[in-house]
Regions:
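Divalent metal-binding pocket/active-site signature
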Residues: 422-464, 502-503, 550-552
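Pro/Ala/Gly-rich low-complexity, hydrophilic intrinsically disordered segments
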Residues: 197, 230-268
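Conserved blade-ending motifs and adjacent loop-strand segments that build the rim/top face
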Residues: 152-157, 195-212
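Divalent metal-dependent hydrolysis catalytic cores, especially in the metallo-beta-lactamase
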Residues: 347-367, 383-394, 418-430, 440, ...
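Metal-associated gating/positioning segment near the N- to mid-region
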Residues: 320-378, 398-399, 405-408, 434, ...
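A flexible loop/linker signature enriched in serine peptidases of the S9 family
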Residues: 1, 8-15, 22, 30-41, ...
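Histidine-rich, glycine-flanked metal-binding segment
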Residues: 282-323
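Active-site neighborhoods of metal-dependent hydrolases
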Residues: 413-431, 477-575
Length: 575
């Protein structure tokens, strides 16, 4: 437990979702490569005998062995806007020999397949995971895909994970971890943290993901941020309805200790004879030179005043303009999908192409977002430096919502996101003011910024300013505003990110671009953005009178200008 993680392979592919063999000597895992697509591999723990198991390209997920390692199950996933749609027909749960031969589909839907204790059935979960349906179910089929049974149903759960001996089930419900006996009474059982007919116990005061069981079924494991947790379970399943303890002790956490260096380029670069827009007011240097040493600007000024070091690689930029990188603090950069990361993230390239060098995404899938962040910072992905909030602290219905009824609830919600490295959280439509105030208090204690969803509710927006939120995301829906609002905002420290392409209380600014320009012909946009994304939004135009725009995002912009003139910090947010 105190060791240092060591990579087992030398593949250039991205690797994910490892599963130990029952003898503990090898690991199954999936890979993704943007050019050759996905596969399933097997490798010994010493890194030897690497073997590709699948023969057909595809998007493969969560492989698992049976008890004697002679069979495997896995999921073939449908396509998506990041990984594409090639080789994604006949998706579902598959059974195959351990060497990948004789694959057959046993279910058209479901995910997270595993074998039953006697290897005669295959369990799988339906309803998705985060951002899936409100109700998840644990089902099973026989090895021919017949005799479908539904064992558990759980509203607002995220994961349902039976132990290998099928005596227990661990589950995640609204980010919290629980364990219960695996009751088999021939019918579907409703399962949640308030189940009374049999014992359901909490595994931890904190949140967790990647829930799984030890090979001997004596421990439940999970991760949170950079820690790996274990908790012992008492085997009392001779009577699953007995109200005896299931959990033996407090969870034990260890640091994973996987450390990657931030990517810092080597050498010097000189951009010569370039027009430079500086950050000194309105200053523009018409014939300038910029010298970059590794990842920092070393010199900047008029070309005639700068001596270029002999070791610098010189780029002559006559006719070009260099400007400071754009910081987009409300940038949705493709971190919503619950799946494997691509090696070239097109949303990153598209943002870079239009000058965005720093992005902050205020609504994401936590694991996806911080994976992208760390891959970018370590040099495995090209993209803007990225920050994010993790899951929004959602006040409405959803399997990812944050129930906040007291200060401890707020601390729990923020701590689970901060564990991944979040420096901000998004309070999203928490309906009551005291809920938002509890989030603010917890955020102050934990040193995290709070950027709330505006929600097109003027009075909530004003209370957010009174209560000291870091900034308001999206525009306030009332325009123009007068001295009372201007004075309040001026005397606060709350910023404003109006995201003008989405305009509450009027026509969205995005639509004006489609009406007045041929967006689908923009070469820079099309170089990095999939054609279907551009065409579906831009080719079928909505034509509206000009006054709709003037009374929409233009009027909002006039209020933004008035606030900026009063000293309110206005942020760029492209949404």
């Amino acid at each position: 437990p105190n060791g240092i993680p060591k990579r087992m392979t030398t593949l250039s592919d991205f690797e994910a979702e490892p599963h130990f063999s029952s003898d503990g000597k090898s690991v199954l895992f999936v890979t993704w490569n943007d050019e050759t697509l996905g596969s399933i591999y097997k490798v010994n723990l010493d890194g030897k005998n690497l073997m590709k198991i699948t023969q057909e390209k595809g998007i493969y997920r969560t492989p698992a062995y049976n008890s004697d390692d002679s069979k495997i199950v896995y999921r073939k996933e449908s396509g998506n806007g990041d990984q594409g749609y090639d080789y994604t027909k006949k998706t579902g749960i598959y059974l195959a020999n351990a060497d990948g031969t004789d694959p057959k589909r046993v279910s058209k839907n479901g995910e997270f397949p595993i074998f039953s204790a006697d290897d005669k059935r295959i369990f799988f979960q339906t309803g998705g995971s985060f951002f899936g349906g409100l109700t998840k179910k644990l089902k099973s089929v026989d090895l021919n895909g017949k005799e479908v049974r539904s064992h558990f149903s759980s509203k607002l759960a995220n994961r349902l994970v039976p132990s290998h001996d099928n005596k227990f089930i661990a589950f995640i419900h609204l980010h919290k971890l629980f364990v219960a006996p695996f009751v088999m009474n021939g019918s579907e059982i409703n399962l949640d943290n308030n189940t009374k007919s049999f014992n359901v116990e909490s595994l931890s005061k904190n949140a967790g993901i990647n829930l799984h069981w030890s090979g001997d079924n004596k421990n439940v494991h999970w991760t949170l941020g950079d820690e790996y947790f274990s908790k012992s379970i008492v085997n009392n399943t001779t009577d699953p309805f007995a109200k005896t303890n299931l959990v033996a002790a407090e969870p034990v956490g260890i640091k994973i200790n996987l450390k990657e260096k931030s990517d810092i380029p080597e050498g010097r670069i000189a951009f010569k004879n370039v027009r430079i827009i500086t950050m000194k007011g309105n200053q523009v240097i018409e014939d300038g030179t910029i010298i970059i040493n590794k990842n920092k600007i070393e010199k900047i000024g008029k070309t005639s005043d700068i001596t270029i070091p002999s070791d610098a690689k010189v780029y002559k930029m006559l006719g070009k303009t260099i400007m400071p990188g754009i910081v987009d603090v409300h940038a949705h950069v493709g971190a919503f999908r619950n799946g494997l990361s691509t090696q070239k993230h097109w949303q990153f390239y598209a943002n870079l192409a239009f000058g965005v060098t720093t992005s902050h995404d205020p609504s994401v899938h936590t694991a996806a977002a911080f994976t992208l962040e760390e891959l970018q910072r370590s040099g495995h992905l090209v993209g803007p430096r990225m920050f994010s909030t993790g899951f929004i602290l959602y006040g409405a219905e959803g399997d990812f919502k944050a129930v906040v009824n007291n200060l401890d609830d707020a601390r729990f919600a923020i701590a689970r996101t901060k564990a991944f490295g979040a420096k901000s959280i998004k309070s999203y439509n928490q309906p009551r003011r005291e809920q938002r105030q509890q989030i603010m208090q917890a955020a102050r204690e934990l040193g995290v910024n709070v950027v709330p969803e505006g929600g097109s509710n003027f009075y909530s927006n004003m209370s957010m300013i009174f209560d000291g939120h870091t900034g308001i995301e999206h525009n306030i829906p009332v325009n123009p505003v007068y001295k009372d609002v201007l004075s309040l905002w001026k005397n606060s420290k709350t910023g404003y990110t109006p995201t003008l392409i989405v305009n509450y209380g009027g026509m969205n600014g995005e639509m004006e671009w489609y009406q007045k320009s041929n967006v689908w012909e923009n070469k820079t946009l099309l170089k990095y953005t999939p054609r279907y994304v551009v065409d579906t939004r831009s080719r079928h135009r909505i034509i509206i009178p000009e006054e709709e725009y003037k009374n929409g995002h233009i009027l909002t912009s006039e209020t933004v200008t008035a606030l900026a003139n009063e000293g309110v910090k206005v942020n760029l947010g492209a949404h």
